[in-house]
C-alpha cells in the first residue's frame, strides 16, 4: 500500500472518531490491543499479525496499544516498523512500570521511577 492509498483508506475508514481528552488528537473510537501479537495466547505468526495491523488501519483504527512488558519488549519492537511506515496516521498508547524476571515468568514487580520510565 503506498502513502496515497493509505491516506485514502484511513480517511474512508468506517469508524467514528473521538478526541483524546484535551489533547486535540483524533482517534478511531476503537483501538487495537497488540499484547497477543507477542505472547500470552500461543505462537504468533508475525506475517498474520502485521496483516492484522494493516487491515485495522484500513478500517479506520488509529489507536494501537502496547507496553514494554509485552514479550519483554518484543511487542514494541514488532510495532516499530508499522508505526514508522504509518506515523502520520497512528497514535500509540503504551504503559510502563511492570518488571518481569526471565527466570520467573510469574513474577511481577513494579518500578515507576523516572529512570525506568525513560528507559522503557
Residue ranges of predicted features:
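Glycine/proline-rich, positively charged
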Residues: 58, 104-120
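Residue-level signal for alpha-helical context at structural boundaries
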Residues: 96-97, 110
Amino acid at each position: 500500500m503506498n502513502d496515497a492509498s493509505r491516506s485514502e483508506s484511513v480517511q474512508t475508514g468506517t469508524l467514528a472518531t473521538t478526541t483524546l481528552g484535551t489533547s486535540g488528537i483524533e482517534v478511531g473510537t476503537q483501538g487495537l490491543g497488540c499484547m497477543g501479537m507477542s505472547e500470552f495466547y500461543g505462537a504468533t505468526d508475525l506475517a498474520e499479525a502485521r496483516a492484522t495491523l494493516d487491515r485495522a488501519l484500513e478500517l479506520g483504527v488509529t489507536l494501537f496499544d502496547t507496553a514494554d512488558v509485552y514479550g519483554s519488549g518484543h511487542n514494541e519492537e514488532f510495532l516499530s516498523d508499522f508505526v514508522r511506515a504509518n506515523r502520520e496516521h497512528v497514535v500509540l498508547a503504551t504503559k510502563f512500570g511492570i518488571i518481569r524476571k526471565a527466570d520467573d515468568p510469574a513474577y511481577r514487580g513494579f518500578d515507576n521511577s523516572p529512570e525506568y520510565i525513560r528507559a522503557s
